[in-house]
Amino acid sequence: MPRARLSRRSLALTAAAAALGATFYGVGAATAKDSVPRSDKDIPNLTDVVNDIKAYYGDTVVDGEHYASADSSYARQLAGIEAKAESQLAHALKHTRHGARPAIVLDVDDTSVLTYNYELEVGFNYTPASNQAYLDSKDMPAVFGMDALAAWAQDQGATVFWITGRPEAQRADTVRNLAAVGYKAPDAAHLFLKNSANPPAYLPCGATCTTIEYKSGTRAHIESLGYDIIGNFGDQYSDLSGGHADKSYKLPNPMYYLP
């Protein structure tokens, strides 16, 4: 974050694209839709789309808070991706480039922590103010299995980095939340947030970077420090595009699309 959000109407279009099985790196995912519907029949009913999203996540309500279920379709899809990733990472860790230190890169929102409850609270209508208010009062739960995968990678000798589009002002909130739900709290050298006021010199695009430029440029910077990024994990195409990773893993997220 910050992130350009889809309107409620576009949410329906994005979810419909996911249902049609758009794929990236071998995993189904939501994509933006450019064509203009010719009639109402081309647009999924928004209530139905939201209900489908809730069913996919196995919506469970406790004390007014919405949680994804560990036996949901979402959790099962994640488990398959994570099992494949662990197998491939285990092989990569045995065949790292000479002299390079192995590393994995994780996005934060809907890759490391789950925004599902927040999205339902705000009607899938992200604003910086509502997001900050949420982070001030609550922690987002870990994405099923990703905390264990990160810990496993660290135990196997890989360094874990996070690259997020969240603003620099949310650094303390992000570190607190990650640590609270099972991740090893990252220091400043291992957690990259978007600093529009003082962008790093290694990003030529500075404050005007697109998400792809910012994230791929930051991965290039990590490589320049002597790391081999053997796995890059994200829930958006823009988390993964631009190279500078040996393998990329697309996690499911039908709630929104970020270019």
What is each PLM-predicted segment?
Residues 2-106:
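Non-catalytic pre-domain segments flanking phosphatase-related domains
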Residues 110, 146-178, 192-193, 235:
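Substrate-recognition element of Asp-dependent hydrolases with the DxDx(T/V) motif
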Residues 38, 64-76, 132-140, 161-166, ...:
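Second-shell loop/turn segments in exported
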Residues 120-137:
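A solvent-exposed, charged loop/short amphipathic helix patch at secondary-structure junctions
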